[in-house]
Curated annotation (Swiss-Prot):
Keywords: TPR repeat. Residues 32-41 have a biased composition (Polar residues). The keyword Oxidoreductase does not apply. PANTHER family: OS04G0476000 PROTEIN, OSJNBA0022H21.17 PROTEIN. It comes from Arabidopsis thaliana. InterPro entries: F-box-like_dom_sf (IPR036047), F-box_dom (IPR001810), F-box_motif (IPR053301), Sel1-like (IPR006597), TPR-like_helical_dom_sf (IPR011990). The keyword ATP-binding does not apply. This is F-box protein At1g70590. TPR repeats lie at residues 142-175. Residues 62-111 form the F-box domain. The lineage of its organism: Eukaryota, Viridiplantae, Streptophyta, Embryophyta, Tracheophyta.
Length: 351
């Protein structure tokens, strides 16, 4: 929205007039002149004082970010992404010094990921990856806590993973909150109350994976009572946030009117969006819909993609479409569709 700046309003009268003096009123004229000079001098002095005070830096009367206790500082800055951390470190020297441990943790996370995935000329070594993540976690980074928790979880050391997820969650990390919620569902014995608490907190913090997981629990009555209205609300939020599985599920809900009014147009919209983001079942469903409408060329593209994505049911339908295309347009149409599928790339998805 374009902002508008209104003109400044005069502090004086709307109208002004010159004083009317007779030529012989010299004493009066002299008095007025001296008053005007004094007023002007006073105004200039006041403006100068105001300008100098506004140019001075604000006092440190209330302290600043770097003066906060370390545990509070970590609660604020621990979830910072690398770009945000770098930007905050450029504010002033005291901020740069205060955030030094977190900047070190970012470097450790980078090395940890190299060791975990064998990237950047480094041979994969899970022990070294975990060591780097733990060192980053010791410096207060919630990102490192989550990464270390993932390694422990993959190793089957679930209690250690849960402890790290909980530390990250209490510092406000949405990914840690989501992982903690899912962990409480999967550990033995499970803890549904804590699981829903952390999933909802993560979802409210805007993490789309948590929004989708929360919707699944509410939709299928998993660990909580079924609530279709709430489920579709969270499916829609996750879908709008770019989570492809939520796009597919909200399409199905619109298609059958589950949890919200039936709306075929919105169902088609979300099914196509899921298909364009690479969801193989959505590609199959969308391909079938196009086939039923006689859109053979478009249909065969989505059916080809669905088959490549592992949807076995797409194969017989695709063969029927191939036969009809060949009979109508010749074999060139089929080759064109396959060429399109070879060059097709999914739209980016939110993990």
């Amino acid at each position: 929205m374009k902002q508008r700046t209104w003109p400044c309003r005069s502090e004086g009268s709307r109208f002004s007039s010159l004083s009317f003096l007779k030529p012989h009123d010299k004493d009066k004229r002299s008095r007025i002149s001296s008053i005007n000079k004094a007023t002007a001098k006073s105004t200039t002095s006041s403006r100068s004082s105001s300008s100098s005070s506004s140019s001075r830096p604000p006092s440190n009367e209330f302290g600043d970010f770097s003066m906060l206790p370390y545990d509070i500082l970590m609660k604020i800055a621990a979830p910072f992404s690398h770009p945000n951390l770098q930007a905050a470190s450029l504010v002033c020297k005291s901020w740069r010094d205060a955030l030094k441990p977190l900047r070190e943790s970012m470097l450790l996370i980078r090395w940890g990921k190299k060791y975990k995935h064998g990237r950047g000329g480094v041979r994969a070594n899970l022990d070294k990856a975990l060591d780097s993540f733990l060192k980053g976690a010791m410096r207060g980074s919630t990102l490192a806590m989550v990464d270390a928790g993932l390694v422990y979880w993959e190793r089957g050391e679930k209690e250690k993973a849960v402890n790290l997820y909980r530390r990250a969650s209490e510092l406000g990390d949405a990914v840690g909150q989501c992982n903690l919620g899912i962990a409480y569902l999967q550990v033995q014995p499970s803890n549904p109350k804590e699981a829903m608490k952390w999933l909802k907190q993560s979802a409210e913090n805007g993490y789309v994976r948590a929004q989708y997981q929360l919707a699944l629990c509410l939709h299928h009555g998993r660990v909580v009572q079924t609530n279709l209205l709430e489920a579709t609300k969270w499916y829609l939020k996750a879908a709008e946030g770019g989570y492809v599985r939520a796009m597919y599920n909200i399409s199905l809900c619109y298609s059958v009117g589950e949890g919200l009014p039936q709306n075929r147009k919105l169902a088609r919209k979300w099914m196509k969006r899921a298909a364009d983001h690479g969801h193989s079942k959505a590609q199959f469903e969308h391909g079938l819909a196009l086939f039923s409408e006689g859109e053979m060329l478009k249909s065969v593209l989505y059916l080809e993609l669905a088959e490549r994505g592992g949807e076995a049911a797409a194969t017989p339908v695709k063969e029927v479409v191939h036969q009809q295309l060949s009979a109508t347009f010749g074999g060139q149409a089929v080759h064109h569709a396959i060429h399109q599928a070879n060059n097709w790339r999914p739209l980016p998805v939110t993990r």
